[in-house]
């Protein structure tokens, strides 16, 4: 008689709990592991209490980011991150969105601040995730709350807080 199958230890994912992260790397400024960035996203979302999400991260250079910035926000020139909330409030729930990140900007700003470019890039991604979760940074009080939450999520992802007084 065969032994019954062993049950795995620890919490098991529910059928409705899934974090899908896709990383599309269209830049040459930094070498970024898609697996590492996916782990950053999953850990940050877990800390945020998100159990379902479909997130696409687009890594681009400054030229492509400038085109996206102009096309979607009407603002000329590159920026660090643009978030596209794609959630339609349908029955699946969870977060759905695309986050475009300029790796060139991350490299440049990291050099100015004296920390690792991949950490700056991860900071941009976490910032985008918080926008998808409903955070905003248009007024000082909201900005302070968002910055504090960014630090919490970066820590949850195993990353240091961003240096500098701007954060």
Each language-model region and where it sits:
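An acidic/histidine-cluster motif and surrounding catalytic segment
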Residues: 1-122, 130-167
